[in-house]
Amino acid sequence: MMSFVSLLLVGILFHATQAEQLTKCEVFQKLKDLKDYGGVSLPEWVCTAFHTSGYDTQAIVQNNDSTEYGLFQINNKIWCKDDQNPHSRNICNISCDKFLDDDLTDDIVCAKKILDKVGINYWLAHKALCSEKLDQWLCEKL
C-alpha cells in the first residue's frame, strides 16, 4: 500500500511539473522580447495570452477540425504540425507539442510569424478585450 501511495504522489508531482500555469508577472517577463513588436505593446501581449489560454502553457483546445496549442493557442492547420493534421501548412516549421512546455522561445518566434502574416487580430481576444485599458496588464514587480 505504501508503494502505491508513493507512486501516486510521484505521478501527481510529475504531472504538476509538466504543466505550467504562469502568473501575470511571469508572462510579462517571459514575453519581454515581444515588447512593441509589430506595434503591439507588452501589456497587449500579456492580456491576449491571459484571454487565450489563461497563462497555461499546456492549454490544448480541440475545435471541430483543428486543435490549438499552448500559451498563444497556435493552430495546427496553419502554424504547426501534429499527428491529427499531418497536412498542416506548418508555417512556423515546428511540431505543435513544442508549444506545450514552459520554454516560450519557440512560441514567441511563431507568434511573431503570425503577427507578421495576419496581424494581432489572429487572436480574437485581442480586439475585444486587449486594445484598451491596459494598465491592469502591467507588472510592477519588474
UniProtKB/Swiss-Prot annotation:
It comes from the Eukaryota. Regulatory subunit of lactose synthase, changes the substrate specificity of galactosyltransferase in the mammary gland making glucose a good acceptor substrate for this enzyme. This enables LS to synthesize lactose, the major carbohydrate component of milk. In other tissues, galactosyltransferase transfers galactose onto the N-acetylglucosamine of the oligosaccharide chains in glycoproteins. Glycans are attached at residues 64, 93. Keywords: Calcium, Disulfide bond, Glycoprotein, Lactose biosynthesis, Metal-binding, Milk protein, Secreted, Signal. The keyword Signal applies. The gene is LALBA. Its main location: secreted. InterPro entries: Glyco_hydro_22 (IPR001916), Glyco_hydro_22_CS (IPR019799), Lactalbumin (IPR000545), Lysozyme-like_dom_sf (IPR023346). One of its GO terms (biological process) is defense response to Gram-negative bacterium. Mammary gland specific. Secreted in milk. Disulfide bonds join 25-139, 47-130, 80-96, 92-110. Ca(2+) binds at residues 98, 101, 103, 106-107. It is found in: Secreted. This is Alpha-lactalbumin. The keyword Signal applies. CDD domains: LYZ_LA. One of its GO terms (cellular component) is extracellular region.
